[in-house]
């Protein structure tokens, strides 16, 4: 028998540049959730996702899933002692995070904190008293022990509303922020922990447009409240959010961030993990599914496979290429997108926007148009940056060159905005363009771009960039013959730009590019491109709406 030999270049050079990386360390003291969504398993995932080193001290072996807690089996006190003692003896520890605590674990931790004195690590206490599924995880004795023996050592306490009630020993009506402020102040007094984060996920609020949630951070030493307002995600899949948030805060503290920064970063991480979600439960589990802890984690093998220096193709052969274009009737992806049920409502509201009509007839207030030009100028900076990133991810030199040409065109468009602002609106300060303040609509758009840039591939970046190009042209094409703004006015000139023949040529190239990206995009993931296109059309609509509503 003849044997073949395959040589593989591993490890690649970029993995040998950082030797003995100094990772921040976080120790989680908590119970298990073998289904992986909460407890110590969620802690380890979260700590790792924040590029920190996770250590554990298991307080209870639980039989638990998102459905319910089936059983709780406490770890013997001597085992908890040995685990905590050995970890803190042999391992560095920047932050301790606690979750589900037993009476034995509290006694051991209390003694250790007293022993360490001023040398103890920072402490984040998530008073796990009630599971998201509604299961009680602690009796009155545990509540008292946490209050008396753990909370006074904590740098921050992170209860949700039901846990606040347990710690306070009473339920209260919560009708507004002042009620939450009072709860936080009372908790700080009872627990002797000066920093309290009251998590508001259990009580979404309503304003005129949408539901939202508020998390309130009380900084006792500064007598200050910081209110974090977040979008309410319409999902029941929130299993493990409390564990995850506390671990994210602990990880951020371990990385050297301040407490407010750490809380902000933790909240955003959890909101993203909830919004993105993950499909890991069986169909019988309708509620309280887990969140996506690893949404921002790279897959090492994918990074290796995309490396042109990778030589293990004999071991891992590339899959036969299937084209998503095969799923598009007529092969025109642009037409497919704008007529797709998920895209069409946002596309129609975008290209038929009242903003364009008011510019075309010259009735838009000057200050609103100036605001739009300023915001669009700042947007184009992001737009050019994403095209540069798209160029770096493009599969071939020709596609890279196209992205660079587009960036040059964007700079020309920015120059037109500079001219309008100087000649029409009297801008004279040379630093004016670097000082433009971004409005909420632009910030939302920019954050979306940042996310797609980090997580998306070349095709997904193209899908996110194309609605801007195509929508402006389509909107102004629909206004052909209807532009009544005086010739020579900034309004008329703006309309002429996007209705011009050269802009139509750019749109034709954009349409070709959309068809081109399908050639190498997996057909089973086509809905991802559809979703991106729909979401960006909605962002474009909101961008014009913001200009209309500017005061």
Curated annotation (Swiss-Prot):
Any one GO molecular-function label of the UniProt entry: thiaminase activity
Residue positions of the active site: 468, 540
Write down the species. Answer: Saccharomyces cerevisiae (strain ATCC 204508 / S288c)
Task: Please describe what this protein does.
Answer: Trifunctional protein with both thiamine biosynthetic and degradative activity. Within the thiamine biosynthesis pathway, catalyzes the phosphorylation of hydroxymethylpyrimidine (HMP) to hydroxymethylpyrimidine phosphate (HMP-P), as well as of HMP-P to HMP-PP. Also has thiaminase II activity and degrades thiamine using water as the nucleophile, resulting only in the formation of HMP (4-amino-2-methyl-5-hydroxymethylpyrimidine) and Thz (4-methyl-5-thiazole ethanol).
Give the UniProt record's GO annotations in the biological process aspect: thiamine biosynthetic process; thiamine catabolic process; thiamine diphosphate biosynthetic process
Could you confirm whether the keyword Transferase appears in this record? yes
Keyword terms: ATP-binding, Hydrolase, Kinase, Nucleotide-binding, Thiamine biosynthesis, Transferase
Task: Describe how expression is induced or repressed.
Answer: By absence of thiamine.
Could you say which protein family the record assigns here? Answer: In the N-terminal section; belongs to the ThiD family. In the C-terminal section; belongs to the thiaminase-2 family.
The source's domain of life comes to: Eukaryota
The Gene Ontology CC terms held by the record are: cytosol
Origin organism lineage: Eukaryota, Fungi, Dikarya, Ascomycota, Saccharomycotina
Gene of this entry = THI20
Q: Which reaction does it catalyse?
A: 4-amino-5-hydroxymethyl-2-methylpyrimidine + ATP = 4-amino-2-methyl-5-(phosphooxymethyl)pyrimidine + ADP + H(+); 4-amino-2-methyl-5-(phosphooxymethyl)pyrimidine + ATP = 4-amino-2-methyl-5-(diphosphooxymethyl)pyrimidine + ADP; thiamine + H2O = 5-(2-hydroxyethyl)-4-methylthiazole + 4-amino-5-hydroxymethyl-2-methylpyrimidine + H(+)
This chain belongs to the protein called Hydroxymethylpyrimidine/phosphomethylpyrimidine kinase THI20
Give the CDD domains listed for this entry. HMPP_kinase, TenA_C_ScTHI20-like
Per the UniProt record, one Pfam family is Phos_pyr_kin
Pathway entry: Cofactor biosynthesis; thiamine diphosphate biosynthesis; 4-amino-2-methyl-5-diphosphomethylpyrimidine from 5-amino-1-(5-phospho-D-ribosyl)imidazole: step 2/3; Cofactor biosynthesis; thiamine diphosphate biosynthesis; 4-amino-2-methyl-5-diphosphomethylpyrimidine from 5-amino-1-(5-phospho-D-ribosyl)imidazole: step 3/3
- Give the PANTHER family listed for this entry: HYDROXYMETHYLPYRIMIDINE_PHOSPHOMETHYLPYRIMIDINE KINASE THI20-RELATED (PTHR20858:SF17), PHOSPHOMETHYLPYRIMIDINE KINASE (PTHR20858)
What is the additional note?
Present with 195 molecules/cell in log phase SD medium.
In this chain, 4-amino-5-hydroxymethyl-2-methylpyrimidine is annotated as bound at 64
In short, the EC number is: 2.7.1.49, 2.7.4.7, 3.5.99.2
Site positions per UniProt: Increases nucleophilicity of active site Cys:
379
Under the heading InterPro entries, the entry gives:
Haem_Oase-like_multi-hlx, HMP/HMP-P_kinase_dom, PM/HMP-P_kinase-1, Ribokinase-like, Thiaminase-2/PQQC, Thiaminase_II
């Amino acid at each position: 028998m003849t044997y073949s030999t395959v040589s593989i270049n591993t490890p690649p050079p970029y993995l040998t540049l950082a030797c003995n990386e100094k990772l921040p360390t976080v120790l989680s003291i908590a119970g298990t959730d073998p289904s992986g969504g909460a407890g110590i398993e969620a802690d380890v995932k979260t700590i790792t996702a924040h590029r920190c080193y996770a250590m554990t001290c298991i307080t209870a072996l639980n039989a638990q899933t998102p459905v319910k807690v089936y059983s709780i089996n406490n770890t013997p006190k001597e085992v908890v002692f040995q685990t905590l003692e050995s970890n803190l003896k042999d391992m560095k520890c920047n932050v301790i995070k606690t979750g589900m605590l037993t009476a034995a674990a509290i006694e051991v931790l209390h003694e250790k904190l007293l022993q360490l004195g001023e040398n103890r690590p920072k402490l984040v206490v998530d008073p796990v008293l009630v599971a998201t599924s509604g299961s009680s995880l602690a009796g009155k004795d545990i509540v008292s022990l946490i209050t008396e023996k753990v909370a006074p050592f904590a740098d921050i306490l992170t209860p949700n509303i039901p846990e606040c009630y347990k710690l306070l020993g009473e339920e209260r009506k919560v009708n507004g922020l002042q009620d939450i402020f009072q709860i936080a102040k009372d908790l700080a007094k009872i627990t002797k922990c000066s920093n309290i984060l009251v998590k508001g996920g259990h009580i979404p609020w309503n304003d005129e447009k949408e539901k939202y949630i508020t998390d309130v951070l009380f900084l006792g030493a500064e007598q200050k409240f910081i209110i974090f307002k977040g979008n309410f995600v319409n999902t029941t899949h929130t299993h493990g959010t409390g564990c995850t948030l506390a671990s994210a805060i602990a990880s951020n503290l371990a990385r050297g961030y301040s407490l407010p920064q750490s809380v902000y970063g933790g909240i955003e991480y959890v909101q993203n993990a909830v919004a993105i979600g993950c499909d890991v439960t069986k169909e019988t589990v309708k509620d309280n599914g887990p969140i996506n802890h690893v949404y921002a984690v790279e897959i090492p093998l994918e990074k290796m496979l995309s490396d042109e220096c990778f030589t293990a193709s004999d071991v891992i052969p590339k899959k036969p290429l299937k084209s998503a274009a095969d799923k598009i009737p007529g092969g025109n992806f642009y037409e497919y997108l704008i007529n797709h049920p998920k895209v069409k409502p946002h596309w129609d509201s975008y290209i038929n926007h009242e903003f364009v009509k008011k510019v075309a007839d010259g009735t838009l207030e000057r200050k609103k148009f100036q605001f739009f030009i300023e915001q669009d100028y700042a947007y184009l900076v992001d737009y050019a940056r994403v095209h540069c990133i798209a160029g770096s991810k493009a599969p071939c030199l020709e596609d890279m060159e196209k992205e660079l040409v587009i960036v040059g065109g964007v700079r020309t468009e920015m120059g037109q905005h500079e001219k309008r602002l100087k000649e029409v609106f009297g801008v004279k300060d040379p630093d004016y363009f670097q000082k433009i303040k971004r409005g909420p609509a632009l910030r939302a758009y920019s954050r979306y771009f940042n996310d797609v840039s980090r997580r998306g591939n070349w095709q997904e970046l193209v899908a996110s960039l194309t609605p801007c190009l195509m929508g402006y042209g389509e909107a102004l094409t629909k206004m052909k013959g209807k532009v009544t703004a005086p010739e020579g006015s900034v309004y008329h000139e703006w309309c002429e730009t996007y209705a011009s023949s050269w802009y139509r040529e750019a749109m034709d190239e954009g349409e070709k590019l959309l068809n081109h990206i399908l050639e190498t995009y997996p057909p089973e993931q086509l809905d991802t491109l559809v979703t991106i296109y729909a979401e960006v059309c909605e962002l474009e609509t909101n961008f014009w709406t913001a200009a209309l509503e500017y005061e």
